[in-house]
UniProtKB/Swiss-Prot annotation:
Pfam families: SDH_C, Shikimate_DH, Shikimate_dh_N. It comes from Bartonella tribocorum (strain CIP 105476 / IBS 506). It comes from the Bacteria. NCBIfam families: aroE (TIGR00507), PRK00258.1-4 (NF001312). GO terms for molecular function: NADP binding; shikimate 3-dehydrogenase (NADP+) activity. Homodimer. GO terms for biological process: amino acid biosynthetic process; aromatic amino acid family biosynthetic process; chorismate biosynthetic process; shikimate metabolic process. NADP(+) binds at G135, A136, G137, G138, A139, N159, R160, T161, K162, Q163, R164, I228, G251. CDD domains: NAD_bind_Shikimate_DH. Pathway: Metabolic intermediate biosynthesis; chorismate biosynthesis; chorismate from D-erythrose 4-phosphate and phosphoenolpyruvate: step 4/7. Involved in the biosynthesis of the chorismate, which leads to the biosynthesis of aromatic amino acids. Catalyzes the reversible NADPH linked reduction of 3-dehydroshikimate (DHSA) to yield shikimate (SA). This is Shikimate dehydrogenase (NADP(+)). Its EC number is 1.1.1.25.
Amino acid sequence: MVDLTIEKTKYPRAFVVGSPIHHSKSPRIHNFWLKQYGLQGEYLAQEVTSEKFNHFITSFKKIGFCGGNVTLPHKQEAFRLADYKDKTATIIGAANTLWYEGDKLCATNSDTYGFSANLDDFASDWGGETALVFGAGGAARAILYALKERGFEQIYLVNRTKQRADNLAQHFGKNIKVYDWHKIHEILYQADLIVNTTSIGIKNPEEKSDSFFCDFHKAKKTALVTDIVYTPLITPFLQQAKSCGLKTVDGLGMLLHQAVIGFERWFGVRPQVTKALRTAILEDMSEERE
């Protein structure tokens, strides 16, 4: 439970808020940067349920927070509560980064930047004409926006619940076509980029054989495959792609890069996503599995 009696400090203090929150890597990322750059500051995880989220958001400035990150299940509510939403948050319809400008609560969504920056790191020439995206949840919104900004002319959207995909395609307008989950083999060969935003096969590795199997042998040999899930680092989706000789990018970098936007705003330094940071987070993940 969030402690609304936290004392104010002379240095910046930021948060990540969600429920559950114990699994969040954000405190490790931000505190790594604070130490690296020799900055006075603090970044704390705050467990806040949906019933208490509104109160937390309207109170955090009074108890010494300058802003923070928002994770599940609060991103859409954070967007609704903000006085100012930038273009990215407005298009996505959800916010994961908050700060104050005067008395106005401001919001953006850094997932779009995080997704693109991660691919820039590992495949700087990523792009093309056609992309294939699996999933139609909140993360898919951020990625569809990133792909449209990158200039993809055709984006195929596939989701087990077709109506959700239809709604998302309608929200983003032209160039997005919804395709049947069980007919992906008909379009797989066209994709220059293949993105998974679902948790298929993560909790149950055998799930892919019953509900979904992507035959990457039918994909372009030059196709790039990425999964936004980073636990495990190499998901079943990426394993399938690797086994067919395709280049893959894991989802950890998206998490690291999306944190840059908030850190710069709260602490005044634009941090770098380095191998040292990635190694530190991977070590934490390894310890959690033991």
